[in-house]
């Protein structure tokens, strides 16, 4: 049996090849797959569960098929789809899980994060994150008409891309001290996250013991997946 972890697909109607690759990925799962964890930025933007764009509904249908075949599906918010709600998760046969969830991964506790909250040196982004994760701010946004929300999402996405182009690469990566801190706080020696688009396996030391941070890849020219089983962990990629 195995458990799969993916993130940062950034599904959007302008990137149909990524959606096709994701559907192919779902169809390839066998009865050996126990669970699929999607750790944020599944969608490139999320303006509410009431969005009438056909893409989210098509994705929900495919996820529901996988869930009906016996695979548990878990969704975590990212910095692009933090408004994703329980209504959509239920339609997709999925369960929303909080950032910082610790799971038992074949006898090994693993901390799951999207990863943006580890980038503490990017102070401008951290302030923005605090604002948009505020329940009152979110409620005000969701009360607006779909067209207004869609326009705001496009504006925020364009601003983010422009700002990131001017930032040093180092501040957009995780802060090593923060990684160790959250792992110590959670009492784990394994952290799995996405967000940075820098897939890799990083050995480190936490409380004097060997530990590991695994970074999931973004789906662009390649698909990425962490495949976990009782026999080990494998970070896999393939061409799209």
From Swiss-Prot:
Pathway involvement of the protein, from the record: Glycolipid biosynthesis; lipid IV(A) biosynthesis; lipid IV(A) from (3R)-3-hydroxytetradecanoyl-[acyl-carrier-protein] and UDP-N-acetyl-alpha-D-glucosamine: step 4/6
Cofactor(s) this protein cannot do without: Mn(2+)
Location within or outside the cell: Cell inner membrane
Keyword Lipid metabolism (UniProt): yes
Sequence positions that bind Mn(2+) 1: 8, 10, 41, 197
Biological processes per GO annotation: lipid A biosynthetic process
Protein name in UniProt: UDP-2,3-diacylglucosamine hydrolase
Species assigned in the record: Cellvibrio japonicus (strain Ueda107)
Gene: lpxH
